[in-house]
Amino acid sequence: DPEYAIKETDLLALFRCTPQPGVDPVEAAAALAGESSTATWTVVWTDLLTACDLYRAKAYRVDPVPSAADTYFCYIAYDIDLFEEGSLANLTASIIGNIFGFKAVKALRLEDMRMPYALLKTYQGPATGLVVERERLDKFGRPLLGATVKPKLGLSGKNYGRVVFEGLKGGLDFLKDDENINSQPFMRYRERFLYSMEGVNHAAAMTGEVKGHYLNTTGATMEDMYERADFAKELGSVIVMIDLVIGYTAIQSMAKWSRKTDMILHLHRAGNSTYSRQKTHGMNFRVICKWMRMSGVDHIHAGTVVGKLEGDPLMIKGFYNTLLDFKTDVNLPQGLFFAQDWASLRKCVPVASGGIHCGQMHQLINYLGDDVVLQFGGGTIGHPDGIQAGATANRVALEAMVIARNEGRDYISEGPQILRDAAKTCGPLQTALDLWKDITFNYASTDTADFVETPTANV
């Protein structure tokens, strides 16, 4: 319905649709709107018993995708009353439900959404938020530093705790569990939690800084997860962790627990690339960013640009803006098709991890700014002189680059020299620079923005 007048209370969704040969794209868009709201494959007499014109979603615009033959941007508006308040499970059952299996379309991807202000107000938002997290940690004016314990699996509890202690003592703010360490036979969660928190407390006492370790509470049931989170709280942890694969309802449940208990909630995006990486089918990661900010997580892995994982610079900037801005404007090069007022939901901290090292510090600060957690796993634990030396190299590199930036220097072009100068008085940094030099992962991104000169979504 190209004549449909969009309401402020409408939820707007943008789909990238590739219809089957012979299927009209306008008809495909209308079918998507119907199936994701009230319609089925035929006319039913019970339509006469409802306000179908109100509840049926409206496909209001269809545009060809630039440089992509037979692919279309389909804009669909949903009335706010179609969705249960504060329920991500209900929202997603409609928006990414049956329509992704439609035979009439070869491929379908959810690219972006605009959440109405009134609906956003029914979601909790981040349990702690960036501002309060910095106040609790007493750390300002720079990115936070972290590392993932390696190897991910197989360490004993005591050796695991030793890694945590050495990394934090060397200068990191956080250590973390990885996504697939839960409570396996080689190390049950209680053992890991106890030794990890011993390392946290020892390092905090020695350095005088607030330290933390992301204790992964992911489990088979909500009862297991609450039990693990409660144990982490009893041990004095300031932060717990969950994986995206636990599902939207479990994520919201843990976010509410974290708000009640004054805990920071870290989310590892394990599993997202199974549906977010390919350009033609699935959903864009920016939508996951929006949903996770709504659901209430405080941290989410959102890309590094220069690391080993998928990440186009413009797209990642769009992810970071989605997580951090109070109002997001339309920005097509960054893949942001809708303006979004975040209804005062707290900021969610992006996390950069995967194949980064101290020699890239100037690039990381340039691309990602201060409001980020930089996590150097292999870039800490792979240091030839040990874990503590790796942590020290990262901390010295970060502080040298922040000082140079604050002094007004061109830290981007001078970055390598700034690092070399800092390494003159820091042996661990010199060793790291000699080892990793300018290693980076330069591959063509599989998911880049479709730049359109004329904004297609200003409504």
Curated annotation (Swiss-Prot):
UniProt cofactor(s): Mg(2+)
Source taxon at top rank: Eukaryota
Active site, per annotation: 150, 268
Cofactor-binding details, from the entry: Binds 1 Mg(2+) ion per subunit.
CC per GO annotation: chloroplast
Family, similarity comment: Belongs to the RuBisCO large chain family. Type I subfamily.
Protein's UniProt name: Ribulose bisphosphate carboxylase large chain
Species per Swiss-Prot/TrEMBL record: Calyptrosphaera sphaeroidea
Gene designation per UniProt: rbcL
